[in-house]
Amino acid sequence: MESATPRCAELHSPPHWRVVDFISDLHLQASEPETFEAWAQYMAHTPADAVLILGDLFEVWVGDDAALEPTSFEARCAAVLCSTAQTKAVYFMHGNRDFLVGPAFLQACQVTGLDDPTALNFAGQRWLLSHGDALCLDDVDYLQFRAQVRSPQWQQHFLAQPLEQRRAIARNIRTQSESRKHAGTVYADVDSTAACQWLQAAHASTLIHGHTHRPAEHDLGNGLHSTVLSDWDLAATPHRAEVLRLTDSGLQRIPLA
């Protein structure tokens, strides 16, 4: 099980940052072009000085070499990231679906990796950022799986397989994911006690996270709060696509769907 208080990285916003956007759980995949197009349009037109992606940008990631195929979906996603990074800072945190995104891909796209968790210092306040999956302590089976696939040994073994074999495994994962979606599988929620411990250790008052697909604000007591990001699904009815925007006035949800 995850440590209740993991080491917290630091991100200090430069003085020129006025607008910071947070997104997560887009689960980009070739079979859902509407969501990809909405994301590409958002990335091209957001007024933010920085876009912080807090996990699960991709439905699955089978290795950085997938983006080297010029006609691949991964290459199209890389092009969007590269283009956005020319005009604003782009940061990426691993989620439970895209934990194999590597430094080679991020460097090629001029995207900066974010540790989970990271404390953002912005406008005189500290905001704790996490994907959120490590805080879902009731999901014991998942946390065991997470520990396995995050190990260097497992990742080295998986990435040593041919790309097409890894893609086949990914297709199987997507099939299972669709089955869970249609079955109405409910995501485990963040453990509020653990969230408070993380916040206190980071000397922050608000946790911003994704993963659970339950956008909301929660009062955790003792002046501590959590804000949950929305997932994106432009094929759903109604559409779901939302940005959490931070300025010196605070947080604001920006619906895109």
Language model: regions and residue ranges:
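Active-site metal-binding loops of divalent metal-dependent hydrolases
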Residues: 24-27, 56-57, 96-98, 132-134, ...
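Conserved beta-sheet core of the metallophosphoesterase superfamily
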Residues: 108-117, 126-128, 133, 139-140, ...
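Core catalytic region of metal-dependent phosphoesterases/phosphodiesterases
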Residues: 7, 16-19, 28-122
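Hydrophobic "anchor" residues on beta-strands that sit immediately upstream
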Residues: 21-23, 51-52, 91, 127, ...
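Active-site-proximal loop/helix segment associated with metal-binding centers of metalloenzymes
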Residues: 130-191
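A short, compositionally biased domain-edge/stem linker segment
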Residues: 1-13
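Short, basic/glycine-rich phosphate-binding loops at helix/coil junctions
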Residues: 18, 22, 56-61, 166-178
